[in-house]
Amino acid sequence: GARTPLEEHLAEGAMYAAGKSGKVNVHFTVSAEHRELFKKLVEEKAGEFAKRYGVDYNITFSEQKPSTDTIAADMDNQPFRDNGKLLFRPGGHGALIENLNDLDADVIFIKNIDNVVPDKLKADTVTYKKLIAGVLVTLQKQAFEYLELLDSGKYTHEQMMEMLQFLQKKLFCKNPETKDLED
């Protein structure tokens, strides 16, 4: 039967976000008013999905911080008022970065409740999420190796040029001042 977006998140997470131990960390940022309903649904469904996909879920919740709320606007883009008081709405996806900063993870996949798909359409999503994660982890590993080399203070001019090429070609970071290093 039809599944809720929360259930689709659990299914998708099992397909590409399980660690070597089979643990899938899933974090939901929800409104305070709906948090208990989400928790109840997780209690009802997580075991079923864990069994189906052979994983263990670590599911956490946070609430979008009110400090990231924005003023609601009417059709004329004027501040919307409810009985004379300005109405504030959740600030949107960008505001969730503050919640993500509170998580301790090397890789975080962000998925909106509006763009989950049923299993028959997940193949491309799973393939590309795995690909993106692989590229990210490879780049991260190389960056950390270069940082260790820089911290050691023991590197050659050739290694410095290699690091510069990595920054420019792999991370797309260019700084006009690096021209002096290239000469």
Where are the predicted features?
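Domain-scale recognition of functional cores that engage charged ligands
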Residues: 1-183
